[in-house]
């Protein structure tokens, strides 16, 4: 018998007008997955929560960003090594310097070229490679 799948989650690819992607540096806490690693913002669905609502909530809770559901565009939902992940993208229309984090150490914009050289947490490198090349 195989193990039960992990919890479902969401992640959001936030893209600025120059085509750069906002990544979040995770806390440097050894008790969390991928400590001190750059990742896409996101989190786990709460019981009964729709994925798009989770994406809105996570961006508000972790970064103080108010992104309406209509501004989120579904990219893919796929089983990953840790559970079912729903990926969305949205245009980023704020200066990252104004983002006040409640989780993580920092946020920063990265070009597609920079992202291609990075080791990201979870399986975010694969997700971004597919997204940035239109796959």
Where are these regions (language model features)?
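Acidic pyrophosphate-coordinating catalytic loop
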Residues: 2-6, 30-33, 76-87
């Amino acid at each position: 018998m195989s193990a039960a799948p992990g919890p479902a989650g969401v992640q959001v690819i936030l893209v600025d007008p120059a085509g750069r992607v906002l990544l979040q540096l995770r806390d440097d806490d050894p008790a969390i997955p991928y400590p001190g690693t750059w990742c896409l913002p996101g989190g786990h669905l709460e019981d009964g929560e729709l994925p798009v609502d989770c994406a809105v909530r996570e961006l508000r809770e972790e970064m103080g960003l108010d992104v309406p559901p209509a501004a989120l565009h579904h990219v893919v939902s796929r089983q990953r090594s840790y559970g079912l992940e729903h990926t969305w993208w949205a245009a980023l229309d704020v200066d990252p310097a104004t983002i006040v984090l409640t989780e993580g150490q920092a946020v920063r914009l990265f070009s597609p070229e920079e992202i291609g050289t990075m080791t990201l947490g979870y399986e975010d490198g694969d997700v971004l490679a597919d997204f940035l090349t239109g796959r």
